[in-house]
A protein has these predicted regions:
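A generic, well-ordered mixed alpha/beta core segment in the N-terminal half of proteins
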Residues: 56-64, 68
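Helical "lid/coupling" subdomains associated with nucleotide-phosphate turnover
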Residues: 2-54, 69-175
């Protein structure tokens, strides 16, 4: 099975891409819905976990973010929200400019996007949170490299706050 996610769901030339890809790939590319993407992410993550219990899996992609609550190999709540790192960079950090106002606008937009699922997810609860995306892994590695957490420590709110403070000292992503 070959699947395409948010990039092709949103692309204006997605079907053209699929036609070209069909010429070289052995199978048809299936553009999957966001919730199916979330389900597959959860299954992939759950097969790498040794602990049991209810978990929240977060995957921040370029165009979307998937949030999944599940137990063992069974996803219970699956959501795909339109708030990926590339989409938010283009929308709120125009021309690579970094400032508090842009951060604030991005946070407001993220909260608005999350508002539709917040109560359901809070009521469901979870024991652990797992980040599965390159975005989360990069944030984690930066906090370790900067000495804001150690190799065994999780990515914390404190570490993320320090990362934000550090980013705000720069005026542009090129710095």
């Amino acid at each position: 099975r070959i699947v395409a996610t948010n990039a092709l769901r949103q692309a204006k030339n997605g079907h053209e891409f699929i036609q070209k890809a069909a010429e070289i790939l052995p199978k048809h590319i299936e553009i999957i819905a966001g919730r199916e993407e979330a389900r597959l992410i959860y299954l992939g993550v759950s097969h790498t976990m040794v602990n049991s219990g209810r978990r929240l899996v977060i995957d921040i992609g370029g165009g979307s973010t998937e949030l999944i609550i599940g137990e063992e190999f069974e996803p219970i709540h699956t959501e795909s929200l339109q708030m990926g790192c590339v989409a938010f960079t283009k929308a709120f950090f125009v021309d690579g400019e970094i400032n508090q106002k842009s951060f604030d606008k991005a946070v407001v937009a993220a909260r608005k996007e999350l508002s539709g699922i917040a109560n359901t997810y809070k009521e469901a609860g979870w024991d652990t949170v797992v980040g599965s995306s390159g975005t989360i892994k990069a944030c984690r590695q930066i906090t370790v490299n900067m000495g804001w957490s150690n190799e065994k420590e999780e990515l914390t709110r404190d570490g993320l706050d320090k990362l934000k403070e550090k980013l705000l000292k720069y005026k542009h992503v090129a710095e």
